[in-house]
Design a protein with these regions (language model features):
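Anionic-ligand binding patches
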Residues: 2-5, 18, 40-208
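Short, glycine/polar-rich helix-capping loops at beta-to-alpha or helix-loop-helix junctions
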Residues: 12-14
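A short, local hydrophobic-aromatic micro-motif
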Residues: 24-25, 177
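A short beta-strand-loop structural module common to alpha/beta enzyme folds
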Residues: 25-33
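Short, structured coil segments at secondary-structure junctions
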Residues: 20-22
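Short, charged, surface-exposed secondary-structure boundary motifs
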Residues: 35-39
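Glycine-rich beta-to-alpha transition loops that act as phosphate-gripper elements at the mouths
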Residues: 6-10
Length: 208
C-alpha cells in the first residue's frame, strides 16, 4: 500500500492532480516560510523544500509512533511553491488591492516569468528514502490592460490569493497573449515534469 501526500492547500494544485486521475491526501505545511535566497528559481526550490520536508517529518514521526497500525509502505510527499518574476522583482501574492494593482500594472503589456519549485520526498518503512528538488520556468506575455480593466479584474477578488495577482486559468485568461513553456506550471504545478522526474528513477505514480 502506497500513498501520495500534497503538502499544499492550493485548490489549483489539488485540481491538477485530480485532473490526471491521482488519488492523494492533502496535508498542508503550516510552518513559517523562511527565505534566504534572492534568485527566483532558488527561492521557489527553497520554499518547496521547506513545505515538503515539514510534512515528511510529520508523516515519519507518526509512522514511527504508530507501528502497530497499518501505515503505507511507501509515501510520496509533494511540496511546491510558485512566484512570478519581472524586471528583477519577485512577485508573490498581493498584500492588498493596491499591491495587486501595482503588480498588474507592471505586468501589463510585458513578458514575465513564472517559476514553480517542486520537492518530492520519498519515504519508506525505514524512513526517508530520497528527495528530488527542481524548478520549472514558463514565460508569459500579457496584453496591455487599461486601468479600468485592471480595477475590474481586481474587483472580482480573483487576484488576491495568486502569485503575481492573476490566475491564468481564470478571468485573467482574456489578457494572456502567449506563453512559452508549461501552462500547468503557471497554474501552480508542473505535473508533466513531476511525472517525468519520477519516471527517471523508476517510479510510476499510477502504480504507486
Amino acid at each position: 500500500m502506497s500513498q501520495i501526500i500534497l503538502a499544499s492547500q492550493s485548490p489549483r494544485r489539488k485540481e491538477l492532480l485530480e485532473q490526471i486521475g491521482l488519488e492523494f491526501e492533502i496535508c498542508p505545511a503550516k510552518g513559517e516560510e523562511v527565505i534566504t535566497k534572492t534568485i527566483p528559481e532558488e527561492v521557489v526550490m527553497e520554499l518547496s523544500k521547506q513545505k515538503a520536508e515539514e510534512v515528511a517529518a510529520m508523516v515519519s514521526s507518526y509512522s514511527e509512533a504508530h507501528r502497530e497500525i497499518t501505515t503505507p509502505s511507501d509515501i510520496l510527499v509533494i511540496g511546491a511553491d510558485t512566484v512570478v518574476a519581472y524586471d528583477g522583482k519577485i512577485l508573490g501574492k498581493p498584500k492588498d488591492e493596491a499591491d495587486a494593482k501595482a503588480m498588474l500594472t507592471m505586468l501589463s503589456g510585458n513578458t514575465h516569468s513564472v517559476f514553480t519549485g517542486v520537492t518530492l520526498v520519498l519515504i519508506d518503512k525505514s524512513g526517508r528514502a530520497g528527495e528530488l528538488v527542481f524548478y520549472e520556468k514558463t514565460d508569459v506575455k500579457m496584453h496591455e490592460m487599461s486601468e479600468e480593466e485592471i480595477d475590474r479584474y481586481i474587483a472580482t477578488g480573483e487576484p488576491m490569493d495568486k502569485a503575481g495577482s492573476y490566475g491564468i486559468q481564470g478571468k485573467c485568461a482574456i489578457y494572456i497573449e502567449k506563453i512559452d513553456g508549461d501552462y500547468n506550471n503557471v497554474v501552480g504545478l508542473p505535473i508533466t515534469r513531476i511525472y517525468q522526474e519520477l519516471k527517471k528513477i523508476g517510479i510510476d505514480i499510477y502504480m504507486w
